[in-house]
Amino acid sequence: MDLSQARAALKAARRVAVLTGAGISAESGIPTFRDAQTGHWARFRPEDLASPDAYRRDPDLVWEWYAGRYRDVLAAQPNRGHELLAELERRKGPGFFLATQNVDGLHARAGSGSAGGELVELHGNLLQARDELTGEVFPLAAPDELTLPPLSPNGQRMRPHIVWFGEYLPVDALDAAQRAFAGAEVALVIGTSSVVYPAAGLAAETLRRGGAVIEINPEATDLTPDATFSLRESASRGLELLLEDD
């Protein structure tokens, strides 16, 4: 498959599934998870802060770290890649499904999930917290009103609404993603190294059932040898190339 054939396949497809990773948000200035360790936090490994054990050991420290990341995310804006995926959803309607490994909420802010298709945040959302007792999810207060640790409306302490090291992805989110990729005529895999499972296995669901997988990533990944077509571009530029004739 070449670029013109990839464009034609995407244009003709009624069912499109998309997986995005950190690469698409890097263009909005969001550091990757491991790049985020600077300043005071440089002496910590991400695993030392983003795990159930870390939270049990020192919830205040974990919340201090997440509060900084929360402020960074709120200061960022969706980029052209986010906007193009929202536009693709508007074109495809209910046949469009987007699963993201990112926790920054930028896809939703760009309009994804509100134009007839579905958005699933596989790893949670930095802009939310959940009640430790009930599991109910609430939006975080504005940074200048945020107290740590935040409390739910019923006074229970809340934890970040994030899937931590050692935790499983939410079953309903993963099931929805697997169904969407299994039924997709075309799957786009954008800005991810394709090494973190189970998300990295989603493209195989599409290939197994005869669908096409189009990868967009600046460097080759573990998926590249199996992808139907692979673009060595940034997320935004790759999407522009795929959609420019529409």
UniProtKB/Swiss-Prot annotation:
Chain residues that bind NAD(+): 21-41, 101-104, 191-193, 217-219, 235
Residues that, per the record, bind substrate: 66, 69
Location, primary (coarse class): cytoplasm
Pfam families named in the record: SIR2
Protein origin, superkingdom: Bacteria
UniProt-listed Enzyme Commission number(s): 2.3.1.286
Translocase among keywords: no
InterPro entries: DHS-like_NAD/FAD-binding_dom, NAD-dep_sirtuin_deacylases, Sirtuin, Sirtuin_cat_small_dom_sf, Sirtuin_class_III, Ssirtuin_cat_dom
Claim: NAD is one of the keywords in the record: yes
Family to which the UniProt record says this protein belongs: Belongs to the sirtuin family. Class III subfamily.
HAMAP family, A to Z: Sirtuin_ClassIII (MF_01121)
Name the record gives this protein: NAD-dependent protein deacylase
